[in-house]
Amino acid sequence: MFRSSRMPFDLFAPPYDRLIPLEAVDDLVGEPKLWPGVSLIWHLGRGKPTRDLGPALHRPGGVSLFVVLPPSPRLRQNPDIFRIVESCRPHSILPFHEEPDATEIASLFARPPMDLPSQVTDYLTWRGIQVDLETRRLVRRTVELSDEVSTVSALSRRLYLSRRALGRRFYNAGLPVPSHLLHFSRVLRAAIRLQRTSDSVATVGNALGYADGFALSNQMHRLTGIRPTEVRSRMGWEWLVEAWLRTERAEGGLRATLRGAPADGAADGADRQARGQDERRAHRNRWHGSDRGSLDGPSERAS
């Protein structure tokens, strides 16, 4: 049976031409910084899955996970391996190979999600955002409808809810306001297209209803702090969702606690109380305000 003395984890990062051995895995776990376009490769054949579960399960938000299965004899000896792997929400599961090919991993990493609404919703759950089934459905539908509508009024009509009811549902769950999720979902669709094609930012923006490439670029930067040029040079989409969550949290729009994040940053009790009052005022204004706010995109496209 093949046994390797090497560490069970590698990193796969730009320029995506090789796997980088990760010897100090503890340095990755709990690391607060964003890792744009980085994935963790877990070689189950190089260690003990139960012992190595922690780094895979508690990897930083935005870091995708690729799992390389052990040789067949070890799979038969440990039928719980797939249950262990599933708990870590892997991007892909690869058959055993002593030296996985970087090109093969890159091709998998570059694939767009098969079901973007469900996968974004699953990612939010993995990050520790717990909501009831109805709110989860509304989140998934918002991401789904982002390909068809561009205003929260149009979104509310499609969801058969008033803007107030929709906003209250998101607010009670500690989520960003619906318009932010809608606009981020549109930006995420643009990012995936930028990664997969050579289309210009203007072409991608026009296809999604933005006035020009600058409008798309500015929207993306406001929501995530990321520009299209960086998106295009990196693979994956989870890190962009993570960038959005962190931006919302820093600005008070996300009150739900992210897994591994401090409950409320470094703010003391007085700051938290003042922030809560500001959030409630902001949410009330957004519920009653115009669709044409600074974060809103162009008018809904004609059907």
Residue ranges and their predicted role:
Residues 137-151, 170, 174, 191-200, ...:
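Basic, amphipathic alpha-helical hairpins
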Residues 3-120:
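DNA-contacting interfaces and partner/effector-binding or oligomerization modules
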Residues 149, 153-180, 205-230:
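Basic/polar phosphate-binding segments, predominantly the helix-turn-helix DNA-binding elements
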Residues 218-303:
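…primarily DNA-binding HTH/wHTH and HhH modules…
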Residues 18-30, 48-55, 79-81, 186-189, ...:
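Membrane-topology and secretion signals of cell-surface/extracellular proteins
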Residues 109-158, 171-184:
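Short, Lys/Arg-enriched, Trp-marked, Pro/Gly-tolerant hinge/linker segments that flank
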Residues 32-34, 57-58, 83-86, 130, ...:
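Structural motif
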Residues 173-208, 234-263:
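Terminal helix-turn-helix DNA-binding modules in bacterial transcription factors
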